């Protein structure tokens, strides 16, 4: 296994262009699926980032989409929808509309993004030798020393692309 940066170029560029922006808030429906989650870990079907730069606000809705290789192997890729519409902060999402059964969670951050990294966990199919992207990770470094890791949620042997884990790594 190796870790490589295999997130599509346009997604990387969209987020790297946000370096220097202030991450104001994180919004998501309050969903915790895994009873073994650790302190500082939160499980959501989608996550919205509210960013401020030069007096403008932007909302990035993040989720994971399921894709298939030519050989039919499933893998997961980070999917981002950008908007300047404030309603996006409260759950509007093309693939995962807001579910009123789960109240939104709002975390005030107020820290500047200093760096953005992408890691993709790549496995080798033993039968074909084909490389398969299994777990994309987005890492946001903030100027207060905190790192935010956003990864797909794995539930035992079952993988769902409809949920993600937010890990807050303190300074």
Residue locations for each model-derived region?
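Surface-exposed, interaction-prone regions used to assemble/regulate multi-protein complexes
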Residues: 1-171
């Amino acid at each position: 296994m190796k870790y490589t940066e295999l997130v599509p170029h346009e997604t990387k560029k969209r987020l790297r262009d946000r370096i220097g922006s202030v991450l104001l808030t994180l919004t998501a429906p309050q969903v915790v699926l895994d009873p073994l989650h650790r302190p500082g870990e939160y499980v959501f079907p989608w996550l919205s980032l509210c960013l401020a730069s030069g007096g403008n606000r932007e909302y990035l809705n993040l989720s994971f989409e399921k894709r298939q290789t030519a050989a039919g192997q499933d893998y997961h890729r980070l999917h981002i929808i950008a908007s300047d519409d404030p309603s996006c902060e409260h759950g509007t999402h093309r693939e995962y509309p807001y579910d009123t059964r789960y109240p939104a969670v709002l975390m005030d951050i107020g820290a500047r993004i200093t760096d953005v990294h992408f890691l993709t966990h790549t496995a080798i199919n033993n039968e074909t030798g084909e490389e398969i992207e299994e777990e994309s990770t987005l890492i946001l470094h903030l100027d207060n020393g905190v790192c935010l890791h956003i990864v797909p949620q794995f539930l035992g042997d079952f993988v769902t692309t409809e949920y993600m884990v937010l890990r807050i790594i303190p300074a």
